[in-house]
């Protein structure tokens, strides 16, 4: 059996790289494993180029100074960089995107959470939106943070540690029930 896998375009999550400060090369390697479509900013493009990583799209209104001749330009226009990238990915039919960033503002991602599956890697945290009824197996003693506001959160398998911080009570599944369409949670990498 061949070790080469054929992946159809857009089956795997795209990769939006907004910043690499403090992001582990091994973790980046895992995100690059299936040759995702890579979208980035000019500054981060230089860092990726130095590592020999092929970029598909650069988010910029500037069109000069190509690092690689086959890079496409994604204009920002009057949007934020995040909105320009998300709108592009949704329009192109991507079901999911992994995002590596040095800055995280939940409000920038909320408008897209019901349109594309988001997984955000920020400061040794993995952040993602979950629906009510979500459950996941984790070892005991792991930290789970609730990043979205909710007034009717019911948990199982978690002990409250701080305002929005929970610790898994034992090896096994934890679950979350709430009234909102989704909540953003984070776990440590």
Q: What feature does the model see in each segment?
A:
Residues 1-21:
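N-terminal nucleotide-binding beta1-loop-alpha1 segment
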